Amino acid sequence: HRDLHSFPTRRSSDLLIQNQYQFIAVKFEESEQYRFEKALAQKPFLPEENEEEEVELANHLQTFGLIKRIESLPEQASKVILGISGGLDSALALLVSHQAMKRLGRDPKDIIAVTMPAQATSKNSNSIAKNLMSKLGVTALEIPIAESVDLHLKSIDHDTKDVTYENAQARMRTLILMDLSNKYGGFVLGTGDLSEIALGWMTYNGDQMSMYAVNAGLPKTWVQRLIRYHADHEYHVLKETLEKILQAPISPELLENQDT
């Protein structure tokens, strides 16, 4: 009761304090030729010095972090299950998973990589995803979701291609991955990066949800740089495919011709 009664008093005090502020108008001249005293980096998160060493260190941190996660699980629940779209984030997550299994002396077939094409999935993205999975020798599954999503949307009487339509696809993919983790004895590896997390560019109960988010500490520029690192080093055999991923427009492909 005391808090409720004191609310008007607090409000009056706040207004009194605001009235005591002194406002000073300051004018600035606008100039198109203005230059900052110090140049602003276009990619501020990437190292300016010892770049190769820093990138190699980032790769080790990702790989050994995932190894630690795998080792903490009972063997019958330690397979890696992840969705592959043919984009930057899922490609990096797959490469890190492959490195982790290799260092653990385990069969790459213990990585279950899943493509889940829908109406807006491009042939190029799907082809890239399949090529990656094939060359890495992982267990590759393709589970189309178009019919499942349509059935779900029909059940809630929704026929508009809007945010509901987009999120339904992301949630359907996560549902499939979670069920596969139970079926095959593993955990869902999240692929989203720090830029997406910071901007909220994800679907709750969709790609936001996983048991271990391997890219969560990396902004998109770092993801791109690490893909380049892998193309030039251990995964040189995948260089052509990884180059295609780097050059492709960034898109969630939840709507036709969608970009970011």
Residue ranges: model-predicted function:
Residues 1, 5-12:
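Short, small-residue-biased leader/transition segments that mark boundaries at the very start
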Residues 13-86, 90-260:
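ATP/NTP-dependent adenylation/nucleotidyl-transfer catalytic domains that generate, transfer
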